[in-house]
């Protein structure tokens, strides 16, 4: 395929392609062409195939969409000693095949010859894996689906960084989501085009710190932020220290219940080293340690008694496929999980598991190779080898790059993937805060949230402008009322007469008191003043001028004191407490 560093042509039906496929699966000298060798400097983290496969399975099973398969493309380095170039390669790390839930989508468009070619390739692979032992032909009549064949072919592919769908996603640290047949064919990537030919309608590549997670489905699935969040939680983590293995305890749940804490495969997972460490390397720099003497004794004893079994295990572990894996006549049956790996110790677990609850086939391949030594006999030895190796090899100091100093007191600056992840987390927090402020959110996606926030801000602006205009109008009316009270026509002489009469009144003159209570548009008014000069008439006239509708009114007189109470409702103009009190004081008490 275009944009891959290596691939095997399974798509043709000739005998040469089948022979090439057989050689690719079992060849001990040519498997390096399928998957580039791991780099020497710097070492990349090597995943445990069981935990990685279970992560992929958990990702698909927990997703609300119907995903057909999931593949993890793991990064490695192809170092050229002559030129000094270090090329980043994305190779097959592991995969999980679930299949289509819709039975109609399993129908193939291939002819009989193509189906026979696929069955023959899988039968030959099964025959080579099982060592020539006869296999049952119960499932020979079942067809190999297009998506299943596409998933199988993907095992033989690898991509240069920046080339192909996974390479472009990893280079740019972004998500590539192709949904629909038009998007797949128009992407310009040959892998996406092949996926569309073999029945896929959605392909997704999500870059992580250690590789790319690819998902495919025979249905059209729209972009989901929840899926990307799950991928970040499952596959983005730090692999610090010199240990290349990934412990199951570093995850939030036990991904490998079949292996205990003493399983050395969780500690030592170097693909190219399947033998036992020599005593000279183990005891380097720590000759006086009693544990080193015990390790040397154990190593010499093992080399003396078990050298034949170790050599046999070394020969078997050089193959890429495990002999205890079978295709059951070349085809997948209901709820079967197939695992390709170079780990001889995987014989402890059944490679093909059958169930009655799920009718879908599950296909899984892995290129991760672990130590082929006996786990139960050499667990203490391998654990001590790890401890000594960590002590002997000091961490290499990386040269500091010129430029800005790392922020927040970090010794090393964050890489672009970690920085992008933190930026997205901060952006998501801002969106959560914005969603809490906006009252009416139409949809939960970010675009709709921004649109609703803009509409809400514009609405608040219009309300503010309306309130300011109403305030200006009320202020103008109050200014006009105050001017009328000070410069009333024909009322100056009468005001002087009233003031003089008030001065001639008794020393115990009564001051005017106005109490106002506003409840919505309803107002309760209480006026207490003297009974001279008809304050009741002035009060009713003031209510009329202020456009206040009277619902109830009462007037009582005690000696020289008059108490007026009224319940009114505001009309066209809304007054607050201070505005209404000032207006009534001006109208009723202008001649008081």
Curated annotation (Swiss-Prot):
Which domain of life does the UniProt lineage start with?
A: Eukaryota
Region spans: Disordered: 261-313, 341-361, 393-422, 465-508
Q: What happens when the gene is disrupted?
A: Minor effect on jasmonic acid response and no effect on glucosinolate biosynthesis. Myc2 and myc3 double mutant has an increased insensitivity to jasmonic acid. Myc2, myc3 and myc4 triple mutant has no jasmonate-related defense response, is devoid of glucosinolates and is extremely susceptible to generalist herbivores.
PROSITE patterns in UniProt? BHLH (PS50888)
MF (Gene Ontology): bHLH transcription factor binding; DNA binding; DNA-binding transcription factor activity; protein dimerization activity
- Cite the record's Low complexity compositional bias ranges: 278-293
Q: Where is the composition biased (Polar residues)?
A: 352-361
Q: Give the region (JAZ-interaction domain) as residue ranges.
A: 82-141
| Induction pattern | Barely up-regulated by jasmonic acid.
Q: Where is the composition biased (Basic residues)?
A: 398-407
Pull one GO CC term from this UniProt entry.
nucleus
Comp. bias regions, Basic and acidic residues: 294-306, 408-422, 468-482
Q: Which SUPFAM superfamilies match?
A: HLH, helix-loop-helix DNA-binding domain
* GO biological process terms held by the UniProt record: anthocyanin-containing compound biosynthetic process; defense response; extracellular ATP signaling; positive regulation of DNA-templated transcription; regulation of DNA-templated transcription; response to jasmonic acid; stomatal complex development
Would I find Cytoplasm among this entry's keywords?
Answer: no
* Keywords associated with the record: DNA-binding, Nucleus, Plant defense, Transcription, Transcription regulation
Coiled-coil residues: none
bHLH domain span: 411-460
Tell me the compartments it is located in: Nucleus
Q: What is its main location?
A: nucleus
Cite the record's note on assembly: Homo- and heterodimer. Interacts with MYB28, MYB29, MYB34, MYB51, MYB76, MYB122, MYC2, MYC4, AFPH2/NINJA and the JAZ repressors TIFY10A/JAZ1, TIFY10B/JAZ2, TIFY6B/JAZ3, TIFY11A/JAZ5, TIFY11B/JAZ6, TIFY5B/JAZ7, TIFY5A/JAZ8, TIFY7/JAZ9, TIFY9/JAZ10, TIFY3A/JAZ11 and TIFY3B/JAZ12.
- Record comment regarding domains: The JAZ-interaction domain (JID) (82-141) is sufficient for interaction with MYB proteins and most of the TIFY/JAZ proteins.
Q: Which PANTHER family match?
A: MYC, TRANSCRIPTION FACTOR MYC3
Query: Function, please?
Result: Transcription factor involved in tryptophan, jasmonic acid (JA) and other stress-responsive gene regulation. With MYC2 and MYC4, controls additively subsets of JA-dependent responses. Can form complexes with all known glucosinolate-related MYBs to regulate glucosinolate biosynthesis. Binds to the G-box (5'-CACGTG-3') of promoters. Activates multiple TIFY/JAZ promoters.
- The name this protein carries in UniProt is Transcription factor MYC3
């Amino acid at each position: 395929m275009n944009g891959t560093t290596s691939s095997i042509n399974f798509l043709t039906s000739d005998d040469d392609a089948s022979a090439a496929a057989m050689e690719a699966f079992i060849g001990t000298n040519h498997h390096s062409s399928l998957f580039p060798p791991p780099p020497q400097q710097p070492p990349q983290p090597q995943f445990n195939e069981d935990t990685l496969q279970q992560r992929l399975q958990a990702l698909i099973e927990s997703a609300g969409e119907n995903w057909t398969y999931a593949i993890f493309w793991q990064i490695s380095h192809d170092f050229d000693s002559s030129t000094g170039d270090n090329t980043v390669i994305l190779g097959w790390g592991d995969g999980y095949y679930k299949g289509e839930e819709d039975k109609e989508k399993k129908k193939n468009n291939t002819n009989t010859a193509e189906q026979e070619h696929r069955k023959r390739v899988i039968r030959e692979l099964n025959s080579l894996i099982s060592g020539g032992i006869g296999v049952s032909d119960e499932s020979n009549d079942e067809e190999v689906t297009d998506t299943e064949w596409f998933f199988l072919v993907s095992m033989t592919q690898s991509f240069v960084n920046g080339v192909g769908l996974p390479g472009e996603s990893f280079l740019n640290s972004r998500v590539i989501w192709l949904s629909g047949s038009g998007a797949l064919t128009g992407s310009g990537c040959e892998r996406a085009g092949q996926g569309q030919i073999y029945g896929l309608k959605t392909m997704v590549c999500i870059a992580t710190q250690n590789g790319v997670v690819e998902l495919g489905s025979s249905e059209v699935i729209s972009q989901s932020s929840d899926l990307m969040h799950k991928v970040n939680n499952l596959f983005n983590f730090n692999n610090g220290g010199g240990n290349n293995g990934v412990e199951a305890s570093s995850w939030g749940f036990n991904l490998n219940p079949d292996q205990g804490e003493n399983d050395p495969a969780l500690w030592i997972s170097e693909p190219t080293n399947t033998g036992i460490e020599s005593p000279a390397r183990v005891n380097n720099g720590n000759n006086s340690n009693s544990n080193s003497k015990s390790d040397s004794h154990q190593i010499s004893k093992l080399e003396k008694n078990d050298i034949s079994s170790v050599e046999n295990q070394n020969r078997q572990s050089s193959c890429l496929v495990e002999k205890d894996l079978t295709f059951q006549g070349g085809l997948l049956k209901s709820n079967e999980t197939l695992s390709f790996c170079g780990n001889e110790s995987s014989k402890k677990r059944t490679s093909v598991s059958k169930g009655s609850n799920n009718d879908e086939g599950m296909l899984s391949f892995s290129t991760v190779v672990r130590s082929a030594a006996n786990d139960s006999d050499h667990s203490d030895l391998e654990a001590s080898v790890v401890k000594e190796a960590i002590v002997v090899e000091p961490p290499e100091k990386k040269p500091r790059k010129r430029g800005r100093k790392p922020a927040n007191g970090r010794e090393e600056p964050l890489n672009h993937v970690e920085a992008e992840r933190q930026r997205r987390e901060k952006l998501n927090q801002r969106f959560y805060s914005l969603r809490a402020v906006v009252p009416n959110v139409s949809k939960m996606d970010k675009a709709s949230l921004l649109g609703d926030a803009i509409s809400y801000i514009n609405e608040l602006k219009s309300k503010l402008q309306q309130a300011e205009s109403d305030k200006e109008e009320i202020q103008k009316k109050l200014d006009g009322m105050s001017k009328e009270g000070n410069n009333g026509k024909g009322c100056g002489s009468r005001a002087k007469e009233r003031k003089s009469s008030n001065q001639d009144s008794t020393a115990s003159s009564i001051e005017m008191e106005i109490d106002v209570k506003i409840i919505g548009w309803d107002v309760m008014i209480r006026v207490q003043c003297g009974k001279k000069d008809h304050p009741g008439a002035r009060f009713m006239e003031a209510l009329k001028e202020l456009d206040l509708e009277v619902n109830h009114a009462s007037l009582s007189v005690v000696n020289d004191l008059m108490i007026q109470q009224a319940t009114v409702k505001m009309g066209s103009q809304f007054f607050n407490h201070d505005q209404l009190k000032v207006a009534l004081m001006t109208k009723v008490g202008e001649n008081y």
